[in-house]
Amino acid sequence: NNKVQHTCQPNCMKSSTIYYGIIPLGGSKMNDYIINFLKEIMAIDSPSGYTKEVIHHCQKEAENLGFHTHQTNKGNLEIYVEGQDDYTVGFCGHVDTLGLMVRSIKSDGTLAFTNVGGPIIPSLDGEYCRIHTRSGKCYTGTILSNYPAVHVYKDAKSAPRDCENMHVRIDEVVKNKEDVQALGIQNGDYIAYDP
């Protein structure tokens, strides 16, 4: 039975049962399903403009639940849910996250970056990240201040934590710009950081 059956009562999700495809969801099973699905999509890197993988994951899940889907030319995902009458309701959401982008490769092999969206840059100091190349390779790294240690830089405590005073150190043996370029990393590559 692939018919979508809605027996939800507003503000009363505990007593509801929703049948999507052949998967009955109600009470704690619904909560577990939602939490697990959210964990799955939050584990997929998806800075604004780099959402192809997370959209594909959502599309696959919706289709597994018996829904008809369509992807627009701009990469938006539409999911069609059959209702009990001809009243149409639309919902929208987003699956992109905040992130960074390689602005330039420095002569010492570190990456200068710019923000994608509006992340609070000072909170990213010491954060692990992943650099996604256009060829599909992914490299790990760490977002760091240009002045990381008080015993070396007397202004370390007061140095601004912003895009101009921070960089990404790649977890590869790189000594210069050419080493980084040999990995396939270039300006405009997306950088996603750990949630």
Regions found by a protein language model. Name each.
Residues 5-195:
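N-terminal hydrophobic/helix-forming segments and targeting peptides
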